[in-house]
């Protein structure tokens, strides 16, 4: 994913549950 898309998803994650945040952490890895 592009950095811009990642940023958008990151902001959306703020509105999601902690489980969703774990998924984003997996993407970082």
UniProtKB/Swiss-Prot annotation:
Q: What is its main location?
A: plastid
Q: Name one GO cellular component term.
A: chloroplast
Q: Where in the cell is it found?
A: Plastid, Chloroplast
Q: Which keywords are on file for this protein?
A: Chloroplast, Plastid
UniProt-recorded name of the protein: Uncharacterized 3.5 kDa protein in ycf33-trnY intergenic region
